[in-house]
């Protein structure tokens, strides 16, 4: 195999089961606010006191300060999204845009890590690293992806029994660009865990974003990340157990291939976004960039929490007035359905 050594039957089964588990936990967390509170607040609190001090220890790969910080930062992101979805007090302009900012910061932090590994060849934090120009290329891909984050002031809370954090301007091409970059990053930095914490983890949020609840990729991503970190801290041996581990080939050609693909795709996304901003004269700080895209319109109309006969009017006002049609003068969520 090009990217990985041949998988054993038990490894194939564990990969598939872990994917189903992550998607299932994400869907479970969407049922209502109490289930979300148990998964992202109560359970981690119990594990922090009684379990993780004994499992996330030195020599397990989960005992570093970085893993502890990463775990609680992922949980904080999931909790913030949960608060925004279920509590109107948090549905404010400058709170709703915090998750996208965190998204960008996390991308840029990973890019720095990619750059740092450029000249490294050997074991780093327990993983084989094969550094090279591909690290630089993928770091640039990540920077382009972060620059292309848009529509963060247009995030809405969906209607219906299941409440979701919906980001209509986060369309499929940005998602694929992010997935390619992130997989290349994990493959470059933690190669023998990249199947689980890269490919499987990304599939666990991309599949729901395309086939279960469109427009909620950011929510799916942060929740599956949080669940993954809970698993990592609780049973850190799982990902590197001989029966389940998926070894990278550590082939420089494989590193180069995925990094080139990530860079090329994100460069195309960047060019298309620049065309949209300058060619269509759209200001990303005042309006949605892709509001004329069929994907945007579908997500917005199926999610906006207004009566059915007012949804087209709300979309038309958002298109004409930009974010002025999405927030009131105090920065609270507002959907303009009547023209001023």
Locate each region found by the language model.
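Generic multipass alpha-helical transmembrane bundles of integral membrane proteins
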Residues: 92-216
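Membrane-interface segments at the starts/ends of alpha-helical transmembrane spans
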Residues: 59-64, 122-135, 246-258
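Hydrophobic alpha-helical transmembrane segments and adjacent interfacial helices
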Residues: 40-59, 79-86, 100-118, 172-188, ...
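Juxtamembrane transmembrane-helix termini
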Residues: 87, 112, 116-119, 154-161, ...
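Hydrophobic cores of alpha-helical transmembrane segments in multi-pass inner/ER membrane proteins
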Residues: 11-21, 70-86, 138-154, 202-206, ...
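C-terminal transmembrane-bundle signature of multipass membrane proteins
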Residues: 15-23, 197-327, 331-332
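Hydrophobic transmembrane alpha-helical segments in integral membrane proteins
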Residues: 1-18, 134-138, 252-259
């Amino acid at each position: 195999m090009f990217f990985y050594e041949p998988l054993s039957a038990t490894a194939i089964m564990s990969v598939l089961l872990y994917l189903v588990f992550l998607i299932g936990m994400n869907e479970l967390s969407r049922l209502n606010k109490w289930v979300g509170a148990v998964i992202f607040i109560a359970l981690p609190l119990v594990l922090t006191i009684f379990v993780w001090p004994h499992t996330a220890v030195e020599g397990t790969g989960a005992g570093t300060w970085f893993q502890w910080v990463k775990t609680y930062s992922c949980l904080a992101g999931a909790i913030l999204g949960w608060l925004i979805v279920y509590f109107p007090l948090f549905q404010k302009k400058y709170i709703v845009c915090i998750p996208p900012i965190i998204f960008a910061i996390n991308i840029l932090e990973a890019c720095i890590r990619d750059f740092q590994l450029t000249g490294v060849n050997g074991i780093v934090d327990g993983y084989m690293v094969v550094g090279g120009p591909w690290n630089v290329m993928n770091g640039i891909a990540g920077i382009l992806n972060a620059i292309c984050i848009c529509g963060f002031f247009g995030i809405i809370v969906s209607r219906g029994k299941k409440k979701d954090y919906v980001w209509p301007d986060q369309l499929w091409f940005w998602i694929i660009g992010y997935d390619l970059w992130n997989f290349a990053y994990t493959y470059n930095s933690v190669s023998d865990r990249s199947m689980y914490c890269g490919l499987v983890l990304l599939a666990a949020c991309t599949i729901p974003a395309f086939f279960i609840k469109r427009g909620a990729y950011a929510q799916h991503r942060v929740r599956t990340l949080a669940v993954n970190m809970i698993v990592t801290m609780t049973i850190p041996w799982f990902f590197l157990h001989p029966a389940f581990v998926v070894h990278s080939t550590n082939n420089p050609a494989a590193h180069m291939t995925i990094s080139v693909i990530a860079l090329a795709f994100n460069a195309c996304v960047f060019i298309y976004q620049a065309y949209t901003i300058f060619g269509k004269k759209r200001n990303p700080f005042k309006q949605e960039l892709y509001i004329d895209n069929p994907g945007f319109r579908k997500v917005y109309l199926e999610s906006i929490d207004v009566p059915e006969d007012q949804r087209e009017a709300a979309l038309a006002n958002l298109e004409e007035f930009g974010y002025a049609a999405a927030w009131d003068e105090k920065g609270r969520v507002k959907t303009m359905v009547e023209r001023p």
